[in-house]
Amino acid sequence: MPFDFRRFDIYRKVPKDLTQPTYTGAIISICCCLFITFLFLSELTGFIANEIVNELYVDDPDKDSGGKIDVTLNVTLPNLPCEVVGLDIQDEMGRHEVGHIDNSMKIPINNAYGCRFEGLFSINKVPGNFHVSTHSAIAQPANPDMRHIIHKLSFGNTLQVDNIHGAFNALGGADKLASKALESHDYVLKIVPTVYEDLNGKQQFSYQYTVANKAYVAYSHTGRVVPAIWFRYDLSPITVKYTERRQPMYRFITTVCAIIGGTFTVAGILDSFIFTASEAWKKIQLGKMQ
């Protein structure tokens, strides 16, 4: 007798004339298919979308920067003329620069009574400060008004991603127009190195920062009020890394199989229970159930 390979078939077929369709089974089947479709589309959406995973570690991620950080500053001083506005930079490596002018622009506003300062400059990766003041002016104004609006203050490159909402421009929109005219403003910044790595392994380097601020009246050694807008910074040793990840294909297939198999199994159990209960009820009504 020849060997019958069909004996390995665990999915034995039942002739249609031996099966019995029911309205309940049809309803359960339709609901089952809709439920599977919903879960499948949800899982497919999650599979297509990229997941952002973040981690912390101690290191300098941008070692090729030469120990420098690019800074972008955009601030408006509506009551201080451009000819007396300047940027000073100093740090613990001995840098002390008064009236920095490279890559900076001063735009007169309010009929030249005010100024919008835009600057792009570099700082060393050591604690220090940069400040907007009148220190570089030849003739000091009698009552320098340091009320201001900060449009942008950012460090490093701007990340070209939409799915990260970090503190890359934490001071953007800071409005100090309601403060006192002769007050100095002190912003203390903690700069946090940040790395973004996409699916292809390409890395982008930037910096987030936290900020605390206070306002006070400062006097020179001659007793004059010398207000300024100070940005005192220090670097955090902790680096934040964001990594794009996508769910592996095998996990997606496993989940889809679990959805389909689990749903059909539960639906089959439910249909069998309802059918058995309805048949028992019919027998009771016919008086056949003892």
UniProtKB/Swiss-Prot annotation:
Family assignment from sequence similarity: Belongs to the ERGIC family.
UniProt membrane topology term: Multi-pass membrane protein
Residue numbers on the Cytoplasmic membrane side: 1-26, 276-290
Function description: Possible role in transport between endoplasmic reticulum and Golgi.
BP GO terms, sorted: endoplasmic reticulum to Golgi vesicle-mediated transport; retrograde vesicle-mediated transport, Golgi to endoplasmic reticulum
Name of the protein this chain belongs to: Endoplasmic reticulum-Golgi intermediate compartment protein 1
Transmembrane segments: 27-47, 255-275
Pfam family, one: COPIIcoated_ERV
Leader sequence segment: none
Lineage of origin: Eukaryota, Metazoa, Chordata, Craniata, Vertebrata
Highest taxon, organism lineage: Eukaryota
Organism (species): Xenopus laevis
